[in-house]
């Protein structure tokens, strides 16, 4: 018999004692528009309609670590997601969003450490 229980260290059977008996899987909506403000409005609308998590779509310059005004970002800013260059962009992105009550996912690779260090 396995002595490990869900919700107890070492969490091999899950971090919640009731796991998904009490709460459903979190499904996040992947979205990002041409600006932090537009993306924020979309996120607020999604939350209003029952979404319990957000997955942020970043534009290509952001994904590879370029600021929006970098010459290599020309023509790509905001085309396939939200551009983030400074912490103010993130603050506008999450304005009025109850981040303590939802889960977020940031699908980004190369610049992951930069954004998580800003949050610390």
Regions found by a protein language model. Name each.
Residues 1-88, 93-100:
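Acidic/polar, glycine-rich intrinsically disordered N-terminal extensions of enzymes
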Residues 61, 109-114:
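Gly/Ser/Thr-rich loops at beta-strand to alpha-helix junctions
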Residues 102-109:
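A short, small-residue-rich loop immediately preceding and capping a beta-strand
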Residues 115-120:
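Conserved small/polar residues in nucleotide/adenosyl-binding loops
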């Amino acid at each position: 018999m396995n002595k490990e229980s869900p919700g107890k260290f070492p969490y091999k059977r899950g971090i919640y004692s009731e796991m998904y008996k009490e709460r459903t899987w979190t499904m996040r909506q992947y979205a990002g528009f041409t600006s932090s403000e537009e993306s924020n409005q979309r996120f607020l609308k999604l939350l209003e309609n029952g979404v319990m998590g957000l997955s942020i779509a970043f534009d290509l310059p952001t994904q590879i670590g370029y600021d929006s005004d970098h010459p290599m970002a020309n023509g790509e800013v905001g085309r396939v997601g939200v551009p983030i260059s400074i912490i103010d962009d993130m603050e506008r992105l999450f304005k009025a969003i109850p981040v303590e009550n939802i889960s977020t996912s940031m699908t980004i690779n190369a610049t992951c450490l930069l954004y998580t260090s800003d949050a610390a």
